[in-house]
Amino acid sequence: MRSPLLASLFALALSIASSEAAISSTEQVPLSGSVPQLDHSELQNVRINKKRPLKGRFLHITDIHPDPHYKTGSTFDSGCHRKPKKDGKSEGKKATENERGNEDLDDKEFDTLIKNEDLAGKWGTAVSDCDCPMSLVNITFDWLKEEWANEVDFVVWTGDNARHDIDRRIPRTPKEIFDSNRMIVDRMLDAFGRDMPIVPSIGNNDIYPHNVLAAGPSRITEEFLLIWKHFIPSEAAHVFERGAYFSVEVIPDRLAVISLNTLFWYDANTLVDGCRDHSNDPGALEMDWLEVQLNNFRQRGMQVWLTGHVPPHMNHYYDNCYLRYGDLALRYQDTIVGHLFGHMNVDHFFFIDVDELEATSELTSTSSNTTLSDLPLLHGPRLPRPGPGKYTAMGRSGARKLEEELRKDFGQMPGPGILKLKDYAVMNVAPSVIPTYYPGIRIFSYNISDEEDSFDQGHSYQGADELLDDEDEGDELEELELPSDNGFFGGLDERENEDIEILKGSGGHRHDVPKGDCSLPSNEDKPHCTFKRKPRHYSKRSPSRTNRALSPLGYTQFYLPSMMKQKKRPKWEVEYTTYKVKTLVPSSPENTTQPLPVPLHLLPRYDPSIFSKPKNKTEEKEVAKKTAKFYKAVKAVTPYRMKDLTIGSWVKLARMLVLEKKRWKKFAELMLVSTETD
């Protein structure tokens, strides 16, 4: 079930691919002669301080896109770089009578000026093509430092730390891109300190020109090795120089994060050639490296998060790269605890499954010279690619198309008696800090309740070597939990109950297609046959399938809904959370071994008096009112109420989204970070 490469929603168009490739050759050719030796002693031996108590949380932040040229009151057509002309002629949608000052305007007048004249706001402009002003960068990192510096165990940071190249008058340069990345590194270190494991990955706008990156060693890989010297382990330096990917043990001997260079798999990168087996293509070599990493971590009984910039949507990866990534995601399901990506700016999740890879394999066999973007899809969303010319971040019609196709894909999943969880991997795509919609940031929580200082063998998953057959595994989904009449959205109507019964008994159309006989040479390379030949590691007892040590438990998404208020500094607020209310506000928090997913004071309508004993009846009534408002506000940000983020929980959520219209409407709203769009 595929949401093919939806990054086309917001991907930068290569206006003149050949000329950009020519330009790139001056920047990205391998260094001739001997490669200048970097002082690898500057690189950090990246390890978490074992004495630092685990909090069971981590941050995922992506697509910051800081723009030092951003000007408040500038026009959108100038990339938010130039104000309207004094004669009333403007590069933007509307012109002002003159460049009037705004220092003497009150808040309401200033808000009206910006809104009515359709100009760039002080804190950024939601639902626009403009990048992040430094004011937005500053309030973001100030908030992270204040609220999360001592409340997370590590940071996942999935790229794009330079502005888009949308203003021909101020073209980007390699120096500006590197300086922009250095600046964000400095903000990260200021917010979290040098003892915090921070795992960055390279984005398609972190290079010049955007999208295209050749294999290293190159000036780009060497520069990023220096820029990220505080984050890359010294033993990973030589691999990073060649490929710009690495791994970090964020909890030594227990949990690792792998930073992937997805640009080697990205089909907009014209300097690479996919992931052909037994080739020296940089994408293939990265896949080989990734498999070795996963195998090594598995042998050590560790768990792994896979992180990168461009998500593995079928339409944005070279076909053979998509197949190889899906192959590894499923074959190492008991080792990979989750997949985190950015790039898209649209909040969503999707699945890679065996049938999806099977359909992809059928398509690729029709032509050896075409990528999936040129082939008709059997299923899943196919979104229009942006045409040449000005980059358009919005693509709001494309976002709606994505919504429709995700709904179709989720609705075609087989019923609980048919679906096998071992055949599924879940991809999570986070929203961006850049206000394509409202800015978004995620705080995940993961299970540390089974002994914080030593995940003993009784609780932690050690990676059994047993290979279980379909009929032996018995991993059918538990029955769907239907919402009660007093649930978040109320009961289901009669039609929706009929839909549930239908889905319990049957699957989507592509699951009914018989698979080829693996004994025939013509079928030996098909995914379902490959899985029978290669070692495949899955287990119901693994953290990706059962809530145990290191399992992902949920996340809370914060956003900036007040960013369009011009003079008042906006505050990060909870947009939604995947948890149940009782998980966020347990009846006896002092008795829980797992820290709260979100500090209570960050929840909406929090008041400390709620959790103190009233002194008299008058105070008791006031506390009761505050308590009722608090719980109502918390319920409003808990639309999903998932017990955890294991694969089975994601599958159940996908079912419920398509079976309940109000719940899907909420999901569609959250995809756009609760931003009202046309």
Swiss-Prot record:
Residues 1-2 are cytoplasmic. The chain crosses the membrane at residues 3-23. Its EC number is 3.6.1.10. Processing by proteases in the vacuole may be required for activation. Keywords: Glycoprotein, Hydrolase, Membrane, Signal-anchor, Transmembrane, Transmembrane helix, Vacuole. It is found in: Vacuole membrane. It comes from the Eukaryota. Belongs to the endopolyphosphatase PPN1 family. This is Endopolyphosphatase.
